[in-house]
Swiss-Prot record:
Keywords: Amidation, Antibiotic, Antimicrobial, Cleavage on pair of basic residues, Fungicide, Membrane, Secreted, Signal, Target cell membrane, Target membrane
Tissue: Expressed by the venom gland.
Protein known as: Antimicrobial peptide AcrAP2
Record flagged with keyword Secreted: yes
Assigned GO CC terms: extracellular region; membrane; other organism cell membrane
Organism: Androctonus crassicauda (Arabian fat-tailed scorpion)
Top-level taxonomy: Eukaryota, Metazoa, Ecdysozoa, Arthropoda, Chelicerata
Family the UniProt entry places it in: Belongs to the non-disulfide-bridged peptide (NDBP) superfamily. Short antimicrobial peptide (group 4) family.
Residues in coiled coil: none
């Protein structure tokens, strides 16, 4: 084989092995820990807090609209 083909094959193998290593050593452990914490119930979502924040946001938005409607238009 010519050197340019060997170099191309080497670079492709290097890139593929780098992606496989990143997949194996980062994605899989994170997925396993996410599944374990989901089974243990650590990641329960607090929907009441989210609903309260949404209500506060809507209230502030309405107050801002009211304030802007009272300002004169230049």
């Amino acid at each position: 084989m010519e050197i340019k083909y060997l170099l191309t094959v080497f670079l492709v193998l290097l890139i593929v092995s780098d992606h496989c290593q990143a997949f194996l050593f980062s994605l899989i452990p994170n997925a396993i820990s996410g599944l374990l914490s989901a089974f243990k119930g650590r990641r329960k979502r607090n929907l009441d807090g989210q609903i309260d924040r949404f209500r506060n946001f809507r209230k502030r938005d309405a107050e801002l609209e009211e304030l802007l409607s009272k300002l004169p238009i230049y």
